Amino acid sequence: MASPPAHRSSKAADEELPKASSTFHPSLWGSFFLTYQPPTAPQRANMKERAEVLRERVRKVLKGSTTDQLPETVNLILTLQRLGLGYYYENEIDKLLHQIYSNSDYNEKDLNLVSQRFYLLRKNGYDVPSDVFLNFKTEEGGFACAAADTRSLLSLYNAAYLRKHGEEVLDEAISSTRLRLQDLLGRLLPESPFAKEVSSSLRTPLFRRVGILEARNYIPIYEKEATRNEAVLELAKLNFNLQQLDFCEELKHCSAWWNEMIAKSKLTFVRDRIVEEYFWMNGACCDPPYSLSRIILTKITGLITIIDDMFDTHGTTEDCMKFAEAFGRWDESAIHLLPEYMKDFYILMLETFQSFEDALGPEKSYRVLYLKQAMERLVELYSKEIKWRDQDYVATMSEHLQVSAESIGANALTCSAYAGMGDMSITKETFEWALSFPQFIRTFGSFVRLSNDVVSTKREQTKDHSPSTVHCYMKEHGTTMDDACEKIKELIEDSWKDMLEQSLALKGLPKVVPQLVFDFSRTTDNMYRDRDALTSSEALKEMIQLLFVEPIPE
């Protein structure tokens, strides 16, 4: 939840809608996705048939890979994962990863291989040691890498971002290689594939990129590589285009739901960002089986946006407290507690949750109960933040994050995603673990909160608001806003290390659980790096076009 404004006393009658004080720009997409027309059934069937043939051709290549050809095997797995194809070969990849981890008989003097092996294993949950990079340290403190060996330099840079606290060799690798890559970039042809890879890595290290966006951007780069596998390339293009069809149908459904929600509730003051919210959630759950997760996530994010804007900008304290009381009842009879302008929204919200139960069916509808609990907790915390606001209370950073790391919606998002997954490894125990707000999810929540605050605080100077984490740090440590923002950026960087350490220590949970949290972190980083792209969504327009509007030429 963004920082709320100072308290305004309520003198309006229940029937009056609070006046909008925001200047949110209108949707950039209007009814664009509502008019989407899918290809004919025969066209789609033909695409799926071709994709299945190609998947089996690639599977044969993967099954023929061994650790005896370690560089080729590691590179193939990395390529498949970057192209968004890893999902189809999870069993084969898991088997190869175990062999790669168990086999220590490889050339430890090959910096590119060492870096790619380290990256691949840590990314996939293996806690391999970083001291293997000590072999490449020079007396001057740099890393031994021939000037012409640019690929190894880039691999080392990307591998080093899978670092934990105290791994000085990886901290030094980032500092050293970044300078060399920046210098190298100035000497490369700007349109060359390798220049694009270097530029992308300097902006966003490979581990932190949104998977579906990386696939879309990497396909044309891979197409120009001399060592490309034609079957892999053709499959990557076809697979992306098939996914895009699914995404557009889901966007059409979510857009129709949103338009009905706003039209019937008459809450026209809220941010109209359903396309951007789908884009955001898609980045966390892009694999083919997770269609229902994407839909539930998008609708939950839309509901949170409405509630956030009511609490944040438009609702009086009295009205918001009435809403909080009614919220936990989950019953139409509670509308008598609400001011008139909230009643239709409340009913529509109940209908939305009922639709989740219907979609999940009798065996999995229990999951919605956990999702409701997560939302109840969210609204409870919004109410606490309003009380802080009204008291002009400035918490310490630690106290603020105890509340705001949770009120940012981390539990609601993770439970929404788990709820829609067909994977039967997601059990009641998974939800109970998530709702206990364990340290791993708390760290993720802190990451989202800090990422949001560091880009929104200056914008919120234009209106009354309660303190963000930036203001809390400024008061607690007596610093300027710029200094506080720099410190919070350091804390954000530390959060990546914390999440990696905590994920490697998780036991007894489905593999998708930590993967999902990292995917949420990646897509959140994309939303909040340098700007609040949800509120000012022009920054996302090109990315949305790439994912949902422009198919890849085959």
UniProtKB/Swiss-Prot annotation:
Keywords from the named record: Cytoplasm, Lyase, Magnesium, Manganese, Metal-binding, Plant defense
Binding residues annotated for Mg(2+) 3, in chain numbering: N452, S456, E460
Location of the region described as Determine the stereoselectivity of the enzyme in the Swiss-Prot/TrEMBL record: 407-411
Listed GO MF terms: endo-alpha-bergamotene synthase activity; gamma-curcumene synthase activity; magnesium ion binding; sesquithujene synthase activity; terpene synthase activity
Signal peptide limits: none
Gene Ontology terms: biological process: defense response; diterpenoid biosynthetic process
Protein location: Cytoplasm
Known EC number: 4.2.3.102, 4.2.3.55, 4.2.3.54, 4.2.3.-
Tissue: Highly expressed in the husk. Detected in leaves.
Residues binding Mg(2+) 2: D308, D312
Binding note for cofactor: Binds 3 Mg(2+) or Mn(2+) ions per subunit.
Catalytic activity field: (2E,6E)-farnesyl diphosphate = sesquithujene + diphosphate; (2Z,6Z)-farnesyl diphosphate = (1S,5S,6S)-alpha-bergamotene + diphosphate; (2E,6E)-farnesyl diphosphate = (E)-beta-farnesene + diphosphate; (2E,6E)-farnesyl diphosphate = (S)-beta-bisabolene + diphosphate
Family that this chain belongs to: Belongs to the terpene synthase family.
Official protein name in the record: Sesquithujene synthase A
Organism of provenance: Zea mays
Gene: TPS5A
